[in-house]
C-alpha cells in the first residue's frame, strides 16, 4: 500500500530515479494505492540527461509493492521494493525500457506496453 508523501523508486529509463507521491487518483476519498493504480508524483531525484527533470510533476503507475496483492487462486505476491513507471496520458510509458519484474495485474488494467517491455511478469 502506497500513501501520499511516500517515496518510490522508478523502474524505467525516463531519467527519474525517485519520486514522491502527491495524490492517489481514483476518487476523492481514496488514500492508498496498490499495484496498477495511477498516482501523481513529483520527481525527487533524476539524472541530468533524462527526459524528466527534478521537480517535474508526472503521472505514474505502480508496478511493484511491498504490501503485495492477493490473487483469486490463493497466491500472495509481494515484492522487495515499491516501484513505479512514469506514464503519459494514454497509458504508455515515457521511457523505452522497464527494469525488474512487474505484476500480471497490469495486463488486466490495460498497461500492455509496460508488460511487454518488462523482463519478467509475475
Swiss-Prot record:
<dbReference type="Pfam" id="PF00238">
    <property type="entry name" value="Ribosomal_L14"/>
</dbReference>
<dbReference type="InterPro" id="IPR005745">
    <property type="entry name" value="Ribosomal_uL14_bac-type"/>
</dbReference>
<dbReference type="GO" id="GO:0003735">
    <property type="term" value="F:structural constituent of ribosome"/>
</dbReference>
<keyword id="KW-0699">rRNA-binding</keyword>
<keyword id="KW-0689">Ribosomal protein</keyword>
<keyword id="KW-0687">Ribonucleoprotein</keyword>
<dbReference type="InterPro" id="IPR036853">
    <property type="entry name" value="Ribosomal_uL14_sf"/>
</dbReference>
<dbReference type="InterPro" id="IPR000218">
    <property type="entry name" value="Ribosomal_uL14"/>
</dbReference>
<comment type="subunit">
    <text>Part of the 50S ribosomal subunit. Forms a cluster with proteins L3 and L19. In the 70S ribosome, L14 and L19 interact and together make contacts with the 16S rRNA in bridges B5 and B8.</text>
</comment>
<comment type="similarity">
    <text>Belongs to the universal ribosomal protein uL14 family.</text>
</comment>
<comment type="function">
    <text>Binds to 23S rRNA. Forms part of two intersubunit bridges in the 70S ribosome.</text>
</comment>
<protein>
    <recommendedName>
        <fullName>Large ribosomal subunit protein uL14</fullName>
    </recommendedName>
</protein>
<dbReference type="GO" id="GO:0070180">
    <property type="term" value="F:large ribosomal subunit rRNA binding"/>
</dbReference>
<dbReference type="GO" id="GO:0022625">
    <property type="term" value="C:cytosolic large ribosomal subunit"/>
</dbReference>
<dbReference type="InterPro" id="IPR019972">
    <property type="entry name" value="Ribosomal_uL14_CS"/>
</dbReference>
<dbReference type="GO" id="GO:0006412">
    <property type="term" value="P:translation"/>
</dbReference>
<keyword id="KW-0694">RNA-binding</keyword>
